[in-house]
């Protein structure tokens, strides 16, 4: 059995995550009382007609505070039944959450006549502390649109061919901000930039002319060797420490040339030594 627990602050994309999981065969329950987690897992194991039952539930601030405070022990009880259980925590910065509620005119579940939206978001953050501390995968949706969020859920949660640590090597551009959910960040802006070659500007690190240009630069090769040596040495230690997800982010200025080229090469090297290695280019349209 596989159980995915979806949590996060209101407005961060939990409904979208459940929709994606439901589309991929998961039996989904929104706003499950946390105290029912062990019972749900037990019943799913006993009564399911599926050889590999797939269940997803959302648990958030609509729960009783006493149930949320018990989340660590409830999660431990579920996992003691040898159930594959992943906790997905979605979030966004406060300004984005405020904007989303303003645009949709939805009411925050904790807001009231005596509690402003900002105060409700603050209180929600405190209530969800026991869950965020135990999250296996944290996804910040501040800069993600609906389609990007759906793709991220599918990539990180549904495309794992084997159990174990899921590694994501991701390129990005600093001008759009660092990925806040990255575990390791490498800044490669010091390398020669193909952007300043007019014939290469419109291409990306996936295109042969850009790759050939970068491959001929000694500094690029030295950077690649240093990063790959570091990752090959230390990523197995992350896996040995029972980390479910590890994100490695490679950043250049725009996220189109240097970071893309290095991310592709690093992904190829890591896929030869590690299981569950995925590659993503955040800022390529």
From Swiss-Prot:
Gene3D superfamilies recorded for this chain? P-loop containing nucleotide triphosphate hydrolases (3.40.50.300)
**Which Pfam family, an example, fits this chain?**
PapZ_C
Q: Where does ATP bind?
A: 8-15
**Any one GO molecular function term:** GTP binding
Listed A to Z, the keywords are: ATP-binding, GTP-binding, Nucleotide-binding
Q: What InterPro entries does the record point to?
A: P-loop_NTPase, RapZ-like, RapZ-like_N, RapZ_C
Can you tell me which residues bind GTP? 60-63
- Superkingdom of origin: Bacteria
The family note in this entry says: Belongs to the RapZ-like family.
Role = Displays ATPase and GTPase activities.
Which HAMAP family has this protein been placed in?
A: RapZ_like
Query: What's this protein's name?
Result: Nucleotide-binding protein PFL_0912
Name its species: Pseudomonas fluorescens (strain ATCC BAA-477 / NRRL B-23932 / Pf-5)
């Amino acid at each position: 059995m596989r159980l995915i627990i979806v949590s996060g602050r209101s407005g961060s994309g939990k409904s979208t995550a459940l929709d994606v999981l439901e589309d991929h065969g998961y039996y989904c329950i929104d706003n499950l009382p946390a105290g029912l987690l062990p019972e749900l897992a037990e019943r799913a194991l006993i009564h399911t007609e599926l050889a590999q039952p797939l269940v997803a539930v959302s648990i958030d601030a609509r729960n009783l505070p006493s149930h949320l405070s018990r989340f660590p022990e409830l999660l431990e009880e579920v996992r003691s039944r040898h159930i594959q259980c992943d906790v997905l925590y979605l979030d966004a910065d406060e300004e984005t959450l405020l904007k989303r509620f303003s645009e949709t005119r939805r009411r925050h579940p904790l807001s009231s006549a005596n509690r402003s939206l900002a105060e409700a978001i603050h209180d929600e953050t405190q209530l969800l502390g026991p869950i965020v501390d135990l999250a296996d995968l944290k996804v910040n949706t501040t800069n993600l649109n609906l389609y990007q969020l759906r793709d991220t859920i599918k990539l990180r949660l549904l495309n794992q061919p084997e159990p174990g640590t899921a590694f994501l090597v991701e390129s990005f551009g600093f001008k759009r901000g660092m990925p806040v959910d990255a575990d390791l960040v490498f800044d490669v802006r010091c390398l020669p930039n193909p952007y300043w070659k007019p014939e290469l500007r419109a291409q990306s690190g996936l295109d042969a002319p850009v790759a050939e240009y970068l491959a001929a630069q000694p500094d690029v090769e030295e950077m690649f060797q240093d990063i790959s040596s570091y990752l090959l040495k230390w990523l197995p230690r992350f896996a040995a420490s029972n980390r479910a997800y590890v994100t490695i982010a490679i950043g250049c200025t725009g996220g189109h040339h240097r970071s893309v080229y290095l991310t592709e090469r690093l992904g190829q090297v890591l896929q030869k030594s590690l299981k569950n290695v995925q590659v993503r280019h955040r800022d390529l349209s």
